[in-house]
Amino acid sequence: ATGSPVAECVEYFQSWRYTDVHNGCADAVSVTVEYTHGQWAPCRVIEPGGWATFAGYGTDGNYVTGLHTCDPATPS
């Protein structure tokens, strides 16, 4: 289950191999990535100014459609 959209200070940059997420906020954020094909993505805590790497869109065009808040303590 995904939460609400993340704040505008959290951005993602996608390529075919990796999706890098940057936290430009003043506080740590818990983020997961939503994909076109509904692929599962982990919940990662990103410290202020920090980065996290998720899967890219690959050869089948499984693009990132958005970032959402999540609870890192909840097993999926």
UniProtKB/Swiss-Prot annotation:
Question: What InterPro entries does the database record attribute to this sequence?
Answer: A-amylase_inhib, A-amylase_inhib_sf
Listed SMART domains: A_amylase_inhib
Q: Which cysteines are joined by disulfide bonds?
A: C9-C25, C43-C70
So which domain of life are we looking at?
A: Bacteria
Q: Which UniProt keywords apply?
A: Alpha-amylase inhibitor, Disulfide bond
The molecular function terms in GO held by this entry are: alpha-amylase inhibitor activity
Whether Disulfide bond counts among this entry's keywords is: yes
Q: What does this protein do?
A: Inhibits mammalian alpha-amylases specifically but has no action on plant and microbial alpha-amylases.
- Record-given protein name: Alpha-amylase inhibitor Z-2685
